[in-house]
Design a protein with these regions (language model features):
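Short, glycine/charged-enriched secondary-structure capping and boundary segments
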Residues: 33-35, 61-64, 86-88, 140-144
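Nucleotide phosphate-binding/pyrophosphate-handling subdomain across enzymes
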Residues: 1-70
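C-terminal helical cap/extension that packs against the catalytic core
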Residues: 17-18, 61-124
């Protein structure tokens, strides 16, 4: 068991400087934030976030927003449970200041936006919020 690794949990791709973590609930987000804080990053990361509407995403946002510079919202690939990228962006823009928010039409657009932003800052890209979000981005970019 000591060597078991759960796919989608704290998977860092060094060559692309992308961290995949399927923090899909409050406990998961708390763990992700603790890890990001432990890394003592010089530049706050860019977050690609897609969440399910039946999760406590309000508390998840309260925890993650202070440690990131930008959030790119994406709709998870689960039509019945997904919180849309537009709804998530509206929640962020209404309730949080000092955070850049962009809406991606799909996983491919989300990673493209994040890579474009990173060209100027070299910030870590963090993909999180649900296994659906991670799966779509990993498949799209052959990072599985």
């Amino acid at each position: 068991l000591a060597n078991v690794k759960l796919v989608g949990r704290m998977n860092y791709h060094k060559t692309s400087n992308i961290l995949f973590d399927a923090a899909h609930n409050v406990d998961g987000i708390n763990g992700l934030v603790a890890a990001l804080n432990a890394w003592h990053l010089k530049i706050k990361p860019t977050l690609i976030l897609g969440v399910l509407k039946d999760k406590d995403y309000h508390e998840m946002l309260d925890t993650i927003v202070p440690v990131v510079q930008r959030i790119i919202t994406v709709t998870p690939n689960n039509k019945t449970r997904a919180l849309s990228a537009d709804e998530l962006a509206a929640e962020l823009l209404t309730n949080y200041q000092n955070i850049d928010v962009e809406i991606a039409s799909d996983a491919s657009a989300a990673i493209s936006l994040a890579m474009r932003v990173r060209e100027s800052s070299q910030a870590l890209i963090v993909v999180t919020g649900s296994f659906y979000t991670l799966s779509a981005i990993q498949k799209d970019h052959r990072m599985a």
